[in-house]
Amino acid sequence: MRRLLCALLALLLLLGGAAGAEEGRLWLHGDFESVETDGYRLQNGFYEYEKIAHKGDISLYAVGYEAESGYALLTPEEAGGDLTYERMEDANLGAAQAGRWRYTDAGSRWDFLAVEAEGFFFSIMIAVPETGAERLDEEVEALISSLSLEAEPTDDTPMLGADTSGFTLVMDTLADDGGGLGRVTAWAAADGGVSVTFQRGAAGEYPFDSAEHLRETFAGEDAERLEDVYISGQSAERWRFTLVLADGSECPAEAVLLPGEEFSYAAVFGLTGGETPENAAMLERLLDSLALS
C-alpha cells in the first residue's frame, strides 16, 4: 500500500493543474451483494467512472466517460462485428433511459445498457453464465430494475475530509474490503504545490486494524512524531516524513492517523511543490479543517 501511495502522490504532482467537471458526476446504484470497485479517476483532464459489482451469479461491469473526453458511446448496431444482438426494452435509470441489448459471447450471456446523462455517457454490461442463463432471468430483471444513476455514491459511513477549496478532485473510489466499504479520495492543488489523499478502511482489515499498522504503512520507520491533532473531537496522531515517489524524487510529507472501532482513517499530505511558505500555509489549512462527515 505504501508503494501505491507513492505512485498516487507522483500522479497528483502531474495532475496538479488538470481541470475536470467535478460537478454533475453520477454514480450507479443498485441492489448488489458486493462491490469490487466504484468510483471516479481523473485521466487526461477528464473523469472516468468504473464500477464492478456482483449479486449471486450475476456480475456487473460499468464504465463512464465525460462527453468531451474523446471517447464515443457506440450502440451494437454502430459498433458492428460478428455478434448477434437482440434489442430489448429500454431500462429506466432515473436520470435517463438506457438502451438495452442482449447477446452471448465467451461463455456468458450479456445484457448491454448504454446511457447518456448530464454530460457523461455510460456503458453497463451485466453477465451471467451462458449455461442455464434462463433460470436467472428473474434475478437479472430485478437487478436492472434496481439500477439508478445518482449524484452521490452509496456510502453512509463517515469519511475523513478537509477544506479542499482550490483543489482538484483526482480520485474518489469505494471498494468492499471485507469489513465494509473502504474509500479513497485524492486531491491536488491547482498549482500542484500540495496534494492529499484520504483513506478509510474497516478496523478489522490490515492496515486499518491497529495504530501500529497505520504508522508502518502510512508514515514509516523514520517518521517524526508531531503534536496530535483533533478530528471531530477525537485525538489523531500526526507524523512528518519523506516519501520517495515512484519516479525516484523525494517529497516532504505528513500523515494524520485516526484508528477507530469500526473504521480507521488516514490522511497523507504531500508537499509536491516543495516546502514553500505558500504550501506550508495550505497544509496548515488542511490540517486545521480535518473532519469526519
Language-model features, listed with the residues they occupy:
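Residues that form generic nucleotide/phosphate-binding pockets
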Residues: 73-79, 146, 213-218, 289
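Generic alpha-helical hydrophobic packing signal
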Residues: 64-67, 98, 200-202, 234-236, ...
